């Protein structure tokens, strides 16, 4: 991962690596024009967040072919710039962004929840702009199909893996997630897209196949010693806390900073 550091970008390109940047539009937009004029923006750039980015900045990203991930939960959770994820702005400028969970140490890597939060926040943003702010930009209602596409096809494209994953297409590897629509929280299901985006949870996943190999079946992960995995996690966390002199309090109202010497 590199920030707006052209020398690191050049090294990444020399090595054939994609360049992932934590990009905050309101803070960094002023640098885009110079980067674009120098030919330093391209399809190997992946910008995460893109919050509060002005229209001129979006046009530069689109023209340069920069790929974009938006982070519904993270942007709101941390109050990044205006706190609003940038999916609507990206779509308005002809960019199809992927969805990113961004920070699995703060909350679970749950793409079902990411889609739901995106749906709700986009609705709130639309109503706020139309009724409170007189916004010049009309917010079009997102459909569940669009959010599922952002979580699958567009996410694969952002990762540069669109030729091998993201959809069930001849020539791509067989990646499947089978959801048990007979589970009571999903039953009866009247619409596939709505069920996945609005109601499904990870507990509803019955089977997972990656590249044709079944890695989860009957709701159980295969080939993983869960007990040993938990032990390794506990050992790692204990080491980090002890090294930092941090004493966790499971009922604390907030994560307090470490004491300074």
Where would I find each of the regions flagged by the language model?
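Alpha-helix N-cap/helix-start motif
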Residues: 28, 79-80, 108-111, 167, ...
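Active-site microenvironment of metallo-dependent hydrolases
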Residues: 146-261
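Structural signal for hydrophobic packing residues in well-ordered secondary-structure cores
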Residues: 12-16, 39, 119-123, 159, ...
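His/Asp/Glu-enriched, well-ordered alpha-helical/loop segment
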Residues: 38-40, 87-183, 199
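Conserved active-site and cofactor/substrate-binding residues in soluble primary-metabolism enzymes
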Residues: 3, 7, 26, 30, ...
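Catalytic metal-binding/acid-base residues of hydrolase active sites
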Residues: 24-25, 52, 74, 104, ...
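Histidine/acidic residue-rich metal-binding segments in metalloenzymes
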Residues: 1-70, 79-97, 113, 163
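Generic beta-strand/beta-sheet core signal
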Residues: 22, 48, 69-71, 100-102, ...
């Amino acid at each position: 991962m590199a920030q707006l550091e052209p020398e690191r970008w050049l090294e990444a390109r020399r090595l054939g690596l994609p360049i992932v940047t934590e990009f905050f539009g309101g803070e960094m937009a002023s640098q885009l024009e110079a980067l674009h004029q120098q030919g330093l923006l391209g399809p190997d750039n992946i910008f995460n967040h893109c919050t509060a980015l002005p229209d001129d900045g979006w046009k530069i990203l689109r023209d340069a072919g920069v790929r974009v991930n938006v982070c519904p939960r993270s942007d709101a959770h941390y109050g990044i710039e205006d706190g609003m994820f940038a999916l609507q702005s990206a779509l308005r400028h002809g960019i199809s962004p992927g969805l990113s969970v961004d920070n699995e140490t703060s909350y679970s890597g749950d793409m079902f929840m990411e889609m739901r939060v995106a749906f709700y926040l986009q609705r709130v943003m639309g109503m706020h702009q139309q009724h409170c702010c007189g916004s010049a930009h009309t917010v079009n209602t997102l459909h569940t199909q669009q959010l599922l596409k952002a979580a699958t096809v567009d996410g694969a494209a952002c990762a540069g893996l669109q030729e091998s994953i993201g959809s069930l297409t001849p020539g791509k590897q067989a990646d499947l997630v089978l959801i048990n629509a007979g589970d009571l929280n999903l039953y009866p299901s009247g619409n596939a897209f709505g069920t996945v985006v609005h109601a499904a949870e990870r507990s509803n996943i019955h089977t997972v196949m990656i590249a044709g190999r079944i890695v989860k079946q009957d709701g159980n992960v295969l080939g993983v010693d869960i007990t040993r995995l938990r032990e390794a996690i506990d050992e790692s966390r204990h080491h980090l806390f002890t090294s930092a002199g941090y004493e966790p309090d499971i009922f604390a109202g907030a994560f307090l900073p470490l004491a300074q010497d």
